[in-house]
Amino acid sequence: MREERPIIALDFPSFEEVKSFLSLFPADERLYVKIGMELYYAEGPDIVRYIKSLGHSVFLDLKLHDIPNTVRSTMAVLSRLGIDMTTVQAAGGVEMLRAAREGLGQGPILIAVTQLTSTSEEQMREDQNIQSTLIASVLHYAKRTAQAKLDGVVCSAHEVKVIKAEVPVGFVCLTPGIRPTGADIGDQKRVMTPHQARAIGSDYIVLGRPITRAADPVKAYHQIKAEWNR
């Protein structure tokens, strides 16, 4: 189920910047892009509709975490936008995860966030009062996500093999924190290259700045895509 296209994180604050960026690509190129909280909260559903109108796939990364009824009804609204993938927080619990699935329906891919790739084990213990290892926490959340019949999880590429050994076949792992060889790792703490992520079993990878801030974003995208698929 591996997606051949790297997902481009559209970490822009405005509609105009998104339009300008997407206009760099050939009209017949079908991208897979991520809309995060900043962009969605700034521009609302119209930004999703616009990107879908261009024929691109949309990963709407809102990381919902609320009471089950609220998550269920919100997912029902999001499903009407024609999104291809979205997220919830695994920490919301199995009941909330199941409610999300019910609200979203069976079309879009629904994945749960385990631990953010910016989170270190020390931070997890101090801030979340979770005294296990980081990988144990991630694996626990992944198993609960599978139990709730979601499609997969967001996790570091370093955790993919451990997760896939413990969950049903077909359970997907989306990995942010991907950086081309030699690139600045930014605020990510657990990173891999696209080729390493493929070798370890990642199904989807997400990159932002290595593409969006490149001198030639189209060239950077195709170089990363080639590395991901070799």
Swiss-Prot record:
GO terms for cellular component: cytosol. Pathway: Pyrimidine metabolism; UMP biosynthesis via de novo pathway; UMP from orotate: step 2/2. CDD domains: OMP_decarboxylase_like (cd04725). HAMAP family: OMPdecase_type1_B. Catalyzes the decarboxylation of orotidine 5'-monophosphate (OMP) to uridine 5'-monophosphate (UMP). This is Orotidine 5'-phosphate decarboxylase. The gene is pyrF. GO terms for biological process: 'de novo' pyrimidine nucleobase biosynthetic process; 'de novo' UMP biosynthetic process. SUPFAM superfamilies: Ribulose-phoshate binding barrel. Keywords: Decarboxylase, Lyase, Pyrimidine biosynthesis. Pfam families: OMPdecase (PF00215). Belongs to the OMP decarboxylase family. Type 1 subfamily. It comes from the Bacteria. Substrate binds at residues 11, 34, 61-70, 117, 179, 188, 208-209. Its EC number is 4.1.1.23. It catalyses: orotidine 5'-phosphate + H(+) = UMP + CO2. InterPro entries: Aldolase_TIM, OMPdecase, OMPdecase_AS, OMPdecase_bac, OMPdeCOase_dom, RibuloseP-bd_barrel. Homodimer. The active site is at K63. GO terms for molecular function: orotidine-5'-phosphate decarboxylase activity.
